[in-house]
Swiss-Prot record:
The keyword Signal applies. The gene is DEFB112. The keyword Transcription regulation does not apply. It is found in: Secreted. Belongs to the beta-defensin family. GO terms for biological process: defense response to bacterium; innate immune response. It holds the Pfam family Defensin_beta_2. Transmembrane segments: none annotated. The lineage of its organism: Eukaryota, Metazoa, Chordata, Craniata, Vertebrata. One of its GO terms (cellular component) is extracellular region. This is Beta-defensin 112. Has antibacterial activity. It comes from Pan troglodytes (Chimpanzee).
Length: 113
C-alpha cells in the first residue's frame, strides 16, 4: 500500500473524538505549565516539542497556512503555525483501507466509518 502523507480535517476530528477521554497532544501542551510546575516539585522534567507533535500528525510548521491547509496549533512560537493539508475526499490517493474490520474495502479518509 502506498504511504499516505495527507491527513484530512474530518479524519483528525474523528481521531480527536476517539481520544477525547484523555488529553490530546495539543491539550497537553496547553496545560503544560501546570504539569511542569508539579513535575518540578517532584524532581521530574517534562519536555514537549510542538514541532515534533505537528510533524507527527502530518503537519508542517510555517508562518502562513495555504488555502488548502488549516491551522491546528502553534509550533515553536506564536508566529509559526502547524498547518495540515485539507485533502480532497474524491481523490483515491486520500483513501485508507477498512483494516479495522478485516476487509479489503476502501473508504475516503474523511468519512465517518
Amino acid at each position: 500500500m502506498k504511504l499516505l502523507t495527507t491527513i484530512c480535517r474530518l479524519k483528525l476530528e474523528k481521531m480527536y473524538s476517539k481520544t477525547n477521554t484523555s488529553s490530546t497532544i495539543f491539550e497537553k501542551a496547553r496545560h503544560g505549565t501546570e504539569k511542569i510546575s508539579t513535575a518540578r516539585s517532584e524532581g521530574h522534567h517534562i519536555t514537549f516539542s510542538r514541532w515534533k507533535a505537528c510533524t507527527a500528525i502530518g503537519g508542517r510548521c510555517k508562518n502562513l497556512c495555504d488555502d488548502s491547509e488549516f491551522r491546528i496549533s502553534y509550533c515553536s512560537r506564536p508566529t509559526t503555525r502547524c498547518c495540515v493539508t485539507e485533502c480532497d475526499p474524491t481523490d483515491p490517493n486520500n483513501w485508507i483501507p477498512k483494516d479495522s474490520v478485516g476487509t479489503q474495502e476502501w473508504y475516503p479518509k474523511d468519512s465517518r466509518h
